[in-house]
Amino acid sequence: MMRAAYFASKLNFKIESTCRASMITQVERIKIVSWERIRDEYIKILKTDKPSIGLVILQKTGLMKYVFPEIDVMYDMEQSPEWHHKDVFAHTLQVVDNAAKLTDKMEIRFAALVHDIAKPNTRRIHPKKGYTFHGHDAVGEKMLDKVGKRMRLSKNLTKYLKKLTLLHLRPIALVKSEVTDSAVRRLMVSAGNELKDLMVLCRADITTKNPRLVKRYLKNFDIVEQKMQVVLDK
């Protein structure tokens, strides 16, 4: 069943209705498949040019509930419209597809998939701000230990995903002119060898359809990278 989702994503085709119906009725049979196999099929989907095709199939057929429940609960989870124009699941799909356009590196694409994994657990309603997700970066980092063990991810991959999830909100905070060199340096030290990958993830996280806003956000990340270079040159 996951292989069908992979081929649909790889070859950009729709699954025939009878086959899709069978996937839905037989969905619980995924329980007999090893987590190593599930992991491998998931990674194959992430390596395609447009992973969202396969990920949507997993969700629509009910497979996602079994193979990645933390992603499944993002579906239809509303975000405040003044901040996000999509629900959490749709936003995540777009980030993954954006990452696929920016890099062939599977690890970054995987990070794009899980970077907001804790939003369902941290969603609160503020009387003026609407929905908030305070701390979803730190909570998400902790959740990935359980995900890594269940999906039989390598320790290195789990560590990598945890780091990018924890840090994905940090770069944009460095745009302000009053930010000190020491603040920039702290992020660089925290990110370490994954700094470039973190910046790719941040750029992929721009999902607005407004070209003016896209240009502004990309420019902000250019400013952050310029500040990093200044610190390196000192």
Would you name each region that the model predicts?
Residues 78-90, 130-134, 174-179, 217-234:
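Short flexible/disordered coil segments
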Residues 88-89, 141-145, 194-197, 230-233:
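Short C-terminal domain-edge/linker segments immediately following a structured domain
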Residues 120, 150, 168-171, 194, ...:
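Hydrophobic alpha-helical segments
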Residues 2-6, 145-152, 207-234:
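Charged substrate- and nucleic-acid-binding regions of tRNA-handling and nucleotidyl-transfer enzymes
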Residues 82-84, 153-218:
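Histidine/acidic-rich helix-loop-helix segments that form or flank divalent-metal centers
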